[in-house]
Amino acid sequence: MLDKTLRMNYLFDFYQSLLTEKQRKYMSLYYLDDFSLGEIAEEFDVSRQAVYDNIKRTEAMLEEYEEKLSLLAKFEKRSEILQQLKEAVDKQATSEELMALLESLDTLE
């Protein structure tokens, strides 16, 4: 499983358009720009607790979106199959093996 920061970055990439502008700003500053809660609080003139609560709520929302839409899971599976395809081509796999991998990629959606 991905570490939390990397997972949140992926989820943010996939689902940021579903967030409010404020949620996007807080998440971007916290996860992408590595701001501390205190720095974000100072930037927006709110308490650290308000920033913390907003980020935790947004993380939960991103996890809910992933649970329902599975964009990250599909991305990871697609990446895994593409890696298997590359390895199969390198080892000169049979056309049946290659077709099986292509079909699994095709049925992923």
From Swiss-Prot:
UniProt superkingdom: Bacteria
InterPro entries xrefs: RNA_pol_sigma_r3/r4-like, UPF0122, UPF0122_fam_protein, WH-like_DNA-bd_sf
Pfam name, any one: UPF0122
Purpose: Might take part in the signal recognition particle (SRP) pathway. This is inferred from the conservation of its genetic proximity to ftsY/ffh. May be a regulatory protein.
HAMAP family per the UniProt record, alphabetical: UPF0122 (MF_00245)
UniProt similarity note: Belongs to the UPF0122 family.
Designated name of the protein: UPF0122 protein BH2485
Naturally occurring in which organism (per UniProt): Halalkalibacterium halodurans (strain ATCC BAA-125 / DSM 18197 / FERM 7344 / JCM 9153 / C-125) (Bacillus halodurans)
